[in-house]
């Protein structure tokens, strides 16, 4: 007897429906075809054990299973449940009447309980697009999948529940999530606030400019000057995620298996801070079974690289293309995957090996050559892609001991949102451009052309600091953002002067 059940394969951050054909005939062999990996092939033993523990017998007839389309590799153990249901249906133990209306996914334990899977949200979206009535999956993933409207999502704990459901011996209750309520309820959930930071007004201003224009930023300062503390507060002043951005961000984290138990939508911008020992694959994604890397997990959020020179140079160099293209392509011999990677890069570093170069009170013990070698760990092309380079000096005791509370993140965020709205209006007719940091040269000439006084200032700065053409564009982008914060349509010399001041690593005084 031939029956069909439906599962799904995750490719990149999207899912493809997999048709599982099960044919039962005379004989005793078990065949599984359709490009399954070793984990899928091992499902035979898990299914036998799960059925036996729950009082069902594995059929003694010959079982042939085909997983189509055959050109897509089927990876992981999430096919256990649909394979088991298909085998039982072919043996007439499970009714096949409702099988075509449901997409089924889940990993089986030996006792028949279901383990969580990766990519539940992507699979749910694909199930709705293909017109399935319902989606049956492990209970731990039910809330994540239930954010998809117009699809009945059933979270189950054991294979027995699924068997009894198809045999009309049990009713399954759909998991219901009010997507918009869930999303907006968690949007203001920020653990850190700029109100807790004393002093550092110039750094706060630089972070505000970075947030307003989506600019990459690096902070240079001595140990303990507050670089990490400031970076952690950046997501709290960024504009809130839109529902579409939230859905895309959640899909990436779902595919990577980074969503917590019973999670639904990610409502706040991601903040990723990998250790400096991270590998290239972990940073950009890939591997034997390709997974999103840190740059994709930071999509629509912040990627914070603390102690930037300590990262392997090859790891830093692979960031160059994603910083420009805002996505990363992972190529293999037979296929290519594309992961989104539109993130704000925020980095921090000491100014020298000892950490006290240019320190107001402590003496630096490094010679100019050591300082230069330390700075040279970061390549010029990577630094060119960082719009804002700001120096942090330690906060004096008088500032730390002040009783007056600093400006809150909420106040700064209001100004940032206002500037972003100006940019949305400006780029309404330019698809794919949402903030000033994404402007290319053509748009810079349209929207960031300085006045005559500003042009002279910029010309002198370019000559004196020996800046590249890319750095020239970066200065104009930052100046455009500063003008937006100032509610100005024209980029003036005042805006350019502030933008030029954010090129600290280009100054002649560095390293000597």
Annotate each PLM feature.
Residues 1-218, 222-225, 331, 471-472, ...:
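Peripheral, non-AAA+ core regions of ATP-driven protein-machinery
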Residues 245-279, 286-287, 434-442, 469, ...:
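Conserved inter-motif catalytic segment of the P-loop NTP-binding fold
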Residues 26, 58-61, 98-99, 131, ...:
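Short loop/turn elements that form and flank the Walker-type P-loop nucleotide-binding site
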Residues 219-260:
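Walker A/P-loop
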Residues 300, 306-307, 318:
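Walker B catalytic acidic pair
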Residues 110, 303-304, 310-311:
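Residues immediately C-terminal
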Residues 39-44, 59, 66-76, 289-290, ...:
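Basic, amphipathic alpha-helical bundle interface domains used for macromolecular binding and assembly
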Residues 208, 265, 270, 281-303, ...:
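Conserved alpha-helical scaffold flanking the Walker A/P-loop in AAA+ ATPase domains
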């Amino acid at each position: 007897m031939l029956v069909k059940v439906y599962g799904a394969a995750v490719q990149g951050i999207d899912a493809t429906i997999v048709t599982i054909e099960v044919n039962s005939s005379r004989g005793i062999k078990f065949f599984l075809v359709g490009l399954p990996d070793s984990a899928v092939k091992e499902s035979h033993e898990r299914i036998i054990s799960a059925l036996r523990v729950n009082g069902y017998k594995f059929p003694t007839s010959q079982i042939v299973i085909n997983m189509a389309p055959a050109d897509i590799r089927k990876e992981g153990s999430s096919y256990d449940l649909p394979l088991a249901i298909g085998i039982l249906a072919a043996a007439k133990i499970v009714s096949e009447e409702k099988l075509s209306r449901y997409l089924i996914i889940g990993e089986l334990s030996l006792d028949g309980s279901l383990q969580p899977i990766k990519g539940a949200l992507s699979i749910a979206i694909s199930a709705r697009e293909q017109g399935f009535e319902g989606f049956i999956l492990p209970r731990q993933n039910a809330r994540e999948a239930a954010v998809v409207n117009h699809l009945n999502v059933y979270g189950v704990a054991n294979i027995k529940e699924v068997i009894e459901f198809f045999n009309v011996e049990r009713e399954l209750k759909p998991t219901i999530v009010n997507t918009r309520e869930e999303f907006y309820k968690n949007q203001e959930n920020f653990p850190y606030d700029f109100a807790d930071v004393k002093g550092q007004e110039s750094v706060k201003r630089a972070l505000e400019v970075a947030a307003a224009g989506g600019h990459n930023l690096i902070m240079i300062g001595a140990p303990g000057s507050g670089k990490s503390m400031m970076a952690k507060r950046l997501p709290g002043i960024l504009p809130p995620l839109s529902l579409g951005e939230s859905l895309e961000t959640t899909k990436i984290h779902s595919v990577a298996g980074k969503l917590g138990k019973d999670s639904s939508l990610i409502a706040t911008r991601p903040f990723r801070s990998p250790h400096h020992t991270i590998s290239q694959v972990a940073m950009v994604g890939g591997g034997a079974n390709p997974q999103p890397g840190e740059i994709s997990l930071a999509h629509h959020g912040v990627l914070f690289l603390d102690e930037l020179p300590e990262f392997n140079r090859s790891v830093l160099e692979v960031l160059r293309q994603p910083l420009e293209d805002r996505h990363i392509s992972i190529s293999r011999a037979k296929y290519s995957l594309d992961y989104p990677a539109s993130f704000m890069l925020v980095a921090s570093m000491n100014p020298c090996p000892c950490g006290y170069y240019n320190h107001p009170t402590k003496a630096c013990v490094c010679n100019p050559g050591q300082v230069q070698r330390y700075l040279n760990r970061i390549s010029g092309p990577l630094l060119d892609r960082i719009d804002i380079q700001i120096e942090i000096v330690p906060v004096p005791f008088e500032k730390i001991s002040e009783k007056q509370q600093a400006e809150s993140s909420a106040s700064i965020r209001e100004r940032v949102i206002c500037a972003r709205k100006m940019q949305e209006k400006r780029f309404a007719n330019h698809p794919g451009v949402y903030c000033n940091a994404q402007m290319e040269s053509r748009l810079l000439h349209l929207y960031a052309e300085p006045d005559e006084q500003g042009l002279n200032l910029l010309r002198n700065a370019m000559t004196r600091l020996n800046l590249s053409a890319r750095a020239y564009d970066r200065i104009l982008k930052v100046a455009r953002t500063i003008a937006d914060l100032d509610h100005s349509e024209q980029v003036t010399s005042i805006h350019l002067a502030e933008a030029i001041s954010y090129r600290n690593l280009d100054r002649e005084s560095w390293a000597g």
